Amino acid sequence: MARHRNVRGYNYDEDFEDDDLYGQSVEDDYCISPSTAAQFIYSRRDKPSVEPVEEYDYEDLKESSNSVSNHQLSGFDQARLYSCLDHMREILGDAVPDEILIEAVLKNKFDVQKALSGVLEQDRVQSLKDKNEGTVSTGKIAKGKPVDSQTSRSESEIVPKVAKMTVSGKKQTMGFEVPGVSSEENGHSFHTPQKGPPIEDAIASSDVLETASKSANPPHTIQASEEQSSTPAPVKKSGKLRQQIDVKAELEKRQGGKQLLNLVVIGHVDAGKSTLMGHMLYLLGNINKRTMHKYEQESKKAGKASFAYAWVLDETGEERERGVTMDVGMTKFETTTKVITLMDAPGHKDFIPNMITGAAQADVAVLVVDASRGEFEAGFETGGQTREHGLLVRSLGVTQLAVAVNKMDQVNWQQERFQEITGKLGHFLKQAGFKESDVAFIPTSGLSGENLITRSRSSELTKWYKGLCLLEQIDSFKPPQRSIDKPFRLCVSDVFKDQGSGFCITGKIEAGYIQTGDRLLAMPPNETCTVKGITLHDEPVDWAAAGDHVSLTLVGMDIIKINVGCIFCGPKVPIKACTRFRARILIFNIEIPITKGFPVLLHYQTVSEPAVIKRLISVLNKSTGEVTKKKPKFLTKGQNALVELQTQRPIALELYKDFKELGRFMLRYGGSTIAAGVVTEMKE
């Protein structure tokens, strides 16, 4: 065969006559220059001298925060001080102690350049002083001892002896005490090991060295400086100050007598939620004319002139391009008696999880409905978001509702159309659990701004409507009772990296209060950290309380371990995390009966977690809560039941009886909400 002939006729001599050396390259035959060798070739003989790297110690950060608190600065000045310190540490590193940097910043009135110049000049003078002292001490040594005895010290090393130093009242072995020439760097004295003859000569020479260096470095300098730097007095003092704060009095002082209220705007997609609230913010003066003019021009170029006011709250390019709100937009405005935190929730069915996140943080709600013919019916009938949003906010604890009947100008402010909408909606909201006294209907027009911040003067409306405008109705809402006396709880809604050290989280404080310098515990990661700064409505503050939407700057923890949905609490009274819990659920309008092993999506605060219904324990009476049936085979629409759920990952939960805000959740399946529930018992 042909392939056999190729093998038998192969000339192997051609392979053996190959003169190429494959073990080295062609260039290795030539000499390499010393400069090239020094630049590109590694020599094992010349071992680089590696200096010991100082470990990051959290106590240093704690001491720096304590030193800042000793100066009793205001919240704004403290934020400026932290900013200056971060800038100076980027240039100087950790070579200069925080106390020196703080004194320099305060002395130069927060001018970073002057403070840096002062610190560098101080270090230069100190280094010259140390150099002069070193030459004087070596001169004294040369006089007190012959040169031969000094050179003979390099023959063998001195045997070190263990030195014990007292730190914070406890005796600990800190290192070795070696006789040698003492020197000073940055205010800390230390001993340098030197070589010398056997022990007898070493002791004799060390006596001379000690007498020579007595004036420059006393023998107890290390111990004294360590005791002074490790004194925990600032920590105790700051703790006492935190305990003495009267949170209720500070709340009144901070708000100027105005009460805080968290408002969420909900409704069917394209009902005009963003336009309505954006126009209200513009009329209140929160948006200046220049910015509004820019939005008008940009929306005209995009072919969406009517979306100009919506762009006040829809800030991302994708939201503006698609013309729908996708994430919860947050801003602040004030009424006569309230400070309102406004949350504009998305209305599209695909973004219901984001809407649940916003509704879970709200105290009251504004439900926006479209008064146009056919549009209201599309949003209110089966498949529309008006019904689902109403059920969601009621299930998440919202009891006060203002219904803004929007786009009334398109139906010429007809009283019949307004009464038709209020009749249908009023009946549904009453079934959902809202009291008639807590629901108000206001005719509005988001595009023209009619009946938003002032009562309408249009004759078509005033001839049959004599009620409040939308802003007056929002101002008349009653704020809920804040849980300031309960342990601290904050649910994370966003995590991001800050420019300085540490990272930032945002969220609403559900209970308790917090101050800068406090220690926090994150659950379920079970990691601790320290609050470096607090920001409320883009302004740095010293503390925040329940109901506030804040941004916290945290240090002492890795950002990778924190996710959206984590809950921060006090280390003394932590929140529990579990994967199995029992709950009482109310089932909505569902097509498929719920059975054992039914998969659901659990929405809790800002968490969205897959879960499974492990057990159907009993069916309960809606009004009395009594057990009507034990161990049911399935659950259908409208039933109230006790079930056991299991999640894939641990979730930090609270019992509904202890924390109502943190005891509610929603269950969704197949893109629709199927049940609302409250936590009754945690299993594991």
Swiss-Prot record:
The keyword Hydrolase applies. GTPase component of the Pelota-HBS1L complex, a complex that recognizes stalled ribosomes and triggers the No-Go Decay (NGD) pathway. The Pelota-HBS1L complex recognizes ribosomes stalled at the 3' end of an mRNA and engages stalled ribosomes by destabilizing mRNA in the mRNA channel. Following mRNA extraction from stalled ribosomes by the SKI complex, the Pelota-HBS1L complex promotes recruitment of ABCE1, which drives the disassembly of stalled ribosomes, followed by degradation of damaged mRNAs as part of the NGD pathway. Keywords: Acetylation, Cytoplasm, Elongation factor, GTP-binding, Hydrolase, Nucleotide-binding, Phosphoprotein, Protein biosynthesis, Translation regulation. One of its GO terms (biological process) is rescue of stalled ribosome. Component of the Pelota-HBS1L complex, also named Dom34-Hbs1 complex, composed of PELO and HBS1L. Interacts with the SKI complex. GO terms for molecular function: GTP binding; GTPase activity; translation elongation factor activity. Residues 267-274 are annotated as: G1. CDD domains: EF1_alpha, HBS1-like_II, HBS1_C_III. The gene is HBS1L. Residues 323-327 are annotated as: G2. The keyword GTP-binding applies. GTP binds at residues 267-274, 406-409, 445-447. This is HBS1-like protein. The modification Phosphoserine is found at residues 49, 67, 117, 127, 152, 154. GO terms for cellular component: cytosolic ribosome; Dom34-Hbs1 complex. Residues 130-241 are annotated as: Disordered.
